[in-house]
UniProtKB/Swiss-Prot annotation:
HAMAP family recorded: Arg_succ_lyase
UniProt keyword Disulfide bond, yes or no: no
Pathway involvement of the protein, from the record: Amino-acid biosynthesis; L-arginine biosynthesis; L-arginine from L-ornithine and carbamoyl phosphate: step 3/3
Subcellular location: Cytoplasm
Name of this chain's protein: Argininosuccinate lyase
Family: Belongs to the lyase 1 family. Argininosuccinate lyase subfamily.
Gene3D superfamilies for this protein: Fumarase/aspartase (C-terminal domain), Fumarase/aspartase (Central domain), Fumarase/aspartase (N-terminal domain)
Entry's transmembrane regions: none
Gene: argH
Alphabetically ordered keywords of this record: Amino-acid biosynthesis, Arginine biosynthesis, Cytoplasm, Lyase
CDD domains, per database record: Argininosuccinate_lyase
PROSITE patterns, sorted: FUMARATE_LYASES
GO BP annotations listed: arginine biosynthetic process via ornithine; L-arginine biosynthetic process
Biological source species: Shewanella baltica (strain OS195)
Annotated EC: 4.3.2.1
Length: 455
């Protein structure tokens, strides 16, 4: 049953129906549409459009429909309805007859779908927050377990300075905490109820929209009917928040893919999250991490899609906005499974401490310590930086680490170098000197973990 047939005399093209119908996508809003309709029944009863008995009958029929569809979800798509609103209204009329035709009084599909979508975002957003918290907890547990495992830190993907695996974990803990905060903020801004805004100018019936918002567990009603039905900021913001979080997931995945490679071999991944090759028997591929990295692109694509759809739309509602859901649903699905998969990867991850330590001891990662040593002896840092660069060139030529130079050899570069230089060049010294808030010294890492666990 079309909800708009009276104006038209000709038949709708089958091709147009296929092109126009959104039920294959918006069927996911079924529960929200029923919940919103129940609240709307109470609202129109409060202004005398329907009687208390009629309101009760409508609400019972809607609740019965909810039970029926939850028992057999295929009912929706088999209906051939134009959209989820048409399906619910047609099913309601089939149950209660002409009474069902009264429910849409004062309501438009414009404020109806805006409400459904915000309800869906609130529900799915809460589930995503729970997933982010689970990933955060898993990463924090890994940081605590491997807080003192030494590994090289990188800039430009070249060994730079030694850090610990716990320090690396805490870097991503910080990122996911920002993701949690960002999502919570987005959900707060989306916590307003458009219902009662009508098609664009507001409903003609003087109902209490504050009560209507409260009935649907929104913090407040929206304040401008034009904005209410035109706004998809909450969709954009959820896609944007997901994109930033997926960027963090993708970067973490890339780090772990490298750490797991034969060239690094700092970590091993569990069999649960890896697969093999159809040809090469020795392969153990980090497919879970590669898919996280790959799915990031499709999330970005959906963000660009909704921004492009909305960028030139005049107020108020336009059919273009029907395209808001498919990308959003895919974003939420992709983000959710990537969060779950990342947590599973971390839960089975093992650090290969000897290999990671050996890599940290190579590549002249203690060069900065030698420069700092020269500074402690009175040499300006820029001069010390140049001197140590010359030492590194000589060490590369001799294929030895800095600490294997004799004192006499080191003095040819700077006469102020004494025997006390050698304790400064150990990995332990490199780490211990970074005993500042946010640094990689072991006490700082332990304090950071304890502070985050105490929250």
């Amino acid at each position: 049953m079309a909800l708009w047939g009276g104006r038209f005399q000709g038949e709708t093209s089958a091709l147009f129906k296929l092109f126009n119908d959104s039920l294959p996508v918006d069927y996911r809003l079924f529960e929200q549409d029923v919940v919103g309709s129940i609240a709307w029944a109470d609202a129109i009863a409060s202004v005398g459009i329907i009687t208390a008995t009629e309101c009760s009958d409508l609400k019972k029929a809607l609740n019965d429909l909810l039970v029926e569809v939850n028992g057999d979800p295929a009912i929706i798509l088999a209906s051939g309805a134009e959209d989820i609103h048409s399906f619910v209204e047609s099913a309601l009329i089939a149950k209660v007859g002409d009474l069902g035709k009264k429910l849409h009084t004062g309501r438009s599909r414009n404020d109806q779908v805006a409400t459904d979508l915000k309800l869906w975002c609130q529900s799915e957003g809460a589930a995503l927050l729970a997933r982010l918290h689970s990933l955060h907890a898993e990463l924090l547990a890994l940081a605590e377990r491997e807080f003192d495992a030494v590994m090289p830190g990188y800039t430009h993907l070249q060994r730079a300075q030694p850090v610990t695996f716990g320090h690396w974990c805490l870097a991503y803990v910080e990122m996911y905490e920002r993701d949690i905060s960002r999502l919570a903020d987005a959900l707060t801004r989306a916590n307003t109820c458009p219902l009662g805004s009508g098609a664009l100018a507001g409903t003609a019936y003087k109902m209490d929209r504050h009560a209507l918002a409260a009935a649907l567990n929104f913090a407040s009603p929206t304040l401008n009917s034009l904005d209410s039905v035109s706004d998809r900021d909450h969709v954009v913001e959820l896609c944007s928040t997901a994109s930033i979080s997926m960027m963090h997931l993708s970067r973490m995945a890339e780090d772990l893919i490298f750490f797991n490679s034969g060239e690094a071999n700092f970590i091993s991944l569990s069999d649960e999250v890896t697969s093999g090759s159809s040809l090469m028997p020795q392969k153990k591929n980090p497919d879970a991490l590669e898919l996280i990295r790959g799915k990031t692109g499709r999330v970005y694509g959906s963000l660009v899609g909704i921004l492009t759809t909305m960028k030139a739309l005049p107020l108020a509602y336009n059919k273009d906005m029907q395209e808001d859901k498919e990308g959003l649903f895919d974003v939420v699905d992709s983000w959710a499974i990537c969060l779950d998969m990342a947590a599973l990867v971390l839960s089975g991850l093992k650090v290969n401490r000897p290999n990671a330590l050996l890599a940290a001891q190579q590549g002249y990662a203690n060069s900065t310590e030698l420069a700092d040593y020269l500074v402690s002896k009175g040499m300006p840092f820029r001069e010390a930086h140049h001197v140590v660069g010359e030492v590194v060139v000589a060490a590369i030529a001799k294929q030895i680490p800095l600490e294997e130079f004799s004192l006499a050899e080191l003095k040819t570069f700077a006469a102020i170098i004494e025997d006390d230089v050698y304790p400064n060049l150990t990995i332990e010294a490199c780490l211990a000197k970074r005993d500042v808030l946010g640094g990689t010294a072991l006490p700082q890492i332990q304090q950071a973990i304890a502070a985050k666990k105490a929250r």
